[in-house]
Amino acid sequence: MRHLIFTGFVLTLTALEAVNVAKSTDNDIVLKVSTEKHSSRDSHHFSGEWLESPWGDLYQFRAGDQNWLTAREHCLSLNADLAAIRNVEQLDWILSHYAPLSSRFAQRLVQIGLYAPEGQTHEWKWLNGNEINKTLLWSSGEPYDHSMEGRERCGLLNVEKRVLDDVDCESTSPDHHAQRYICQRTSENHKQQQRSNNYIWQKIENLFSFFGIGGSPTPHNATIPNDYEDEVLKNETSATVKSTVKFSDSEEETSSEEEESVSKTLAALPKIEGSGESTALKELQEPEGSGQIVEKKAIETTGDLVSGVDEEKLDKMINKMEEMIKSIDDLTVPPAVLERTTVSTVVLKKEEIVKQEKTDEKKVEDKKETLANELNDNKISESIEGDFDQAQSKDMPKADIEPPKEEDCDEEGSGSGSGEEDEKDESSEKIELAPEKEDKIKEFLGVLRLFLDRAEHGDLRKLLDDQSGKTLLERMKNAVREANRREFEMLEKLENSKKSEEEKEELAKKDQMSTEEQKDLYKKISSAVMKAAKIHKIEEADKVQDEQAMEKFNIAKVKADSEEAESEGTVEVLKSAKEGKAEIKEKVGNDDYYGDYLDDNNVIKIQNREKKDAKEESSSDDKKSTDEKKKEIKKIEKTNKVNHDEPKKEEKKNEEQVKETKLESSTTVAKKEDVTTVASTTEEPKSDKDSEGSGSDIEESTVSSAKPAEAEENEAELEASGHEEVSTTTESTTVAVKEVPVDEIEKIAKLEAKQHTEDEKVTVETKQETAVTPAPTTSEKTSTTAAPSTKPAEETTTTTEAPSTTTKPVTVAVKKVSPEEMEKLVKKESTEKVTLLPPLPTFTFPTLAPFTFPTLPTLATTKPSPAPKVPTLEEILGNLNDQFKKLLSPPKPLPK
């Protein structure tokens, strides 16, 4: 029960000082209560509690719109200074109060107690005089004074980078954001500040001194045996005086006047017997948070204790204490803000005062009688001292006494107002929260908003099912971090997918050919196609030419087989056929009709050329149809003419044989002198050549026969149709003639006379038939007559026409050739002549018997065999172009 008495006693004194009830007669008593509440401070200023560090110093973390000098002045007003950081451990402890740290946050700077003394620009020190530890780093390029007047002499701490920076001491934030700063106070200064500013702790000390717990003895009136219960009864009688409160308009009183008024009020109060001197009520300063526990003082010695305790009296005291506690709870409701309160007492009537005094005296007398049997004051003090002994009170329940908070200190002593005004104030009163609570509420709402924005469907269920013992705020923060992590993972996946797509696109671009490469490839392919087409065309032309040449070769072979020996005429025919083939090859090879397909605008040219070719084909088809009809008509006419001319030709042959017999008789005389035989075959289409003569008077006679009218018509038609002529030429052969003695000539003549009963002239006629080809050819028949005569005028040539053959005039030149010239000509021919057939056997005319070629039967004209249909070059190129376009066209995009 003793601890309950002590607790009630402390609460009673606290309530009395808070209410400040005074008793006065006539004068008004004025009591000024501090109105500088935390809510009335600057809206940009945030304060905190004093936090004790592991090394004993106390720190307060603040924020406001101020520069470095203003921050230091504020710390000095609190009996502190800006924080100094001595090592990395202190830095870590300070930065732990600015968690969380992240490079994603905006830059946070803290004003600390670092400065450069006047005149020293490179030696920075802390405000307590210590030098900077080398383990603390500066930001890059700092410290460096960027101002022209040397104003950057104060230090800052970068929270995120953990480095130091310099700043102008008088500069503030341009965007008026809250500037952070830290105040540092030693433990000794903190205790001193708490004693001077916290009046509650001063009253507690007075309370301890009242009970004799203190260093200096307090005067004690031992003659009056009144205990604490009597004093309480006296206070109750004085508290029954009704009091009213009125507001005063005077706001110009100084602190000295207020102290005088307070001292008068306290003097008017009834003094407690046995207590120490009353302490004056000071003007309340700005609350400084929680204080330190005051040291326990020695207990003063008192008189002897009285044995025995009245339990009924203790029960009454406990009941009264409970009632007082209830009244104190009613008074702790925060009243409206009042700058000044005036307490006035109303003087009661004298009768009532007299009655009260009588009742008081009776009570006092009764108590004096009962107190003789109660404990002595010394025993009571010893019992109280035992209560404070920790060893004795170890097992007893304890009541913790906590100092009031800043809000309670500011609001205490405000008093109560009058009836009507109190009701208005209570209706208009609003609950004000401490800045720490506001920050927590804001933080909670911000985290809740982030959680609702970023959380998924299952996050709320996880949050409710979480039984880890963490607070709701921490669980929501963890959920937000998890959502952020998911978003970062999704962003990384998207970035990786984009990178992979870009790489695929780059590879596709690299694989695709550029337009220039496509053009080059198209040119190469088209050139290869053109070459292949030309080779194909040449091969087709070679096949046709080979067929024509084989026909000519077969005809010549048949003639050679029918004869006993080969003649120069057959060789020339075969040679002319081969030369005609070579000329056709050259013409076909030089055809560069499709050379312009390699241009850039090849597609347009191909289309235009196809249109022209279609027109030409239509016109050529019409011409071919008309040409074929004309050819059929001409063939019919030729067959009719041949049948009509055959009897005439036979008559002419008979006449020619008669003439030849006459000529042979005249040649026998000439053989005795000279024997010359020259056979020359030359092809001259429309002109006569002069014969060559070296030292001889032999003349050459030429007989030209014009082409038939039918051949001229055929040539004109073929030229109009645009076909090329394929002409065959025969080279002339010269035979050297030797001078033979007369005796040998006679012998030869005798031998010939024996062999031939009838002298005949040796004639050699070569017939050349025209083969039916796409281009018109001129068939020539060369005849060589060996006419040894004494006179050049007697030289003659005979021509015979066979059906479907044409003969050309052949000039025979007779001259004397020396053996040396003949040898030279033979060597020259051997070097220049190209052998198209196996080498022919050499022979000499004198050793051969004269012979005549039999008349060859007329051969039917062979119809041209239709060549197989070959695709044109335009068709081949068109198909190839279509295929190349498909190959060179860009690939279709893949379906996404």
From Swiss-Prot:
Disulfide bonds join C154-C169. Residues 1-18 form the signal peptide. GO terms for cellular component: extracellular region. CDD domains: CLECT. Glycans are attached at N133, N221, N235. GO terms for molecular function: carbohydrate binding. Transmembrane segments: none annotated. The keyword Signal applies. Keywords: Disulfide bond, Glycoprotein, Lectin, Secreted, Signal. Residues 54-178 form the C-type lectin domain. Residues 354-382, 395-406, 427-436, 575-590, 607-663, 683-692, 740-768 have a biased composition (Basic and acidic residues). Residues 250-260, 407-426 have a biased composition (Acidic residues). This is C-type lectin domain-containing protein 180. The gene is clec-180.
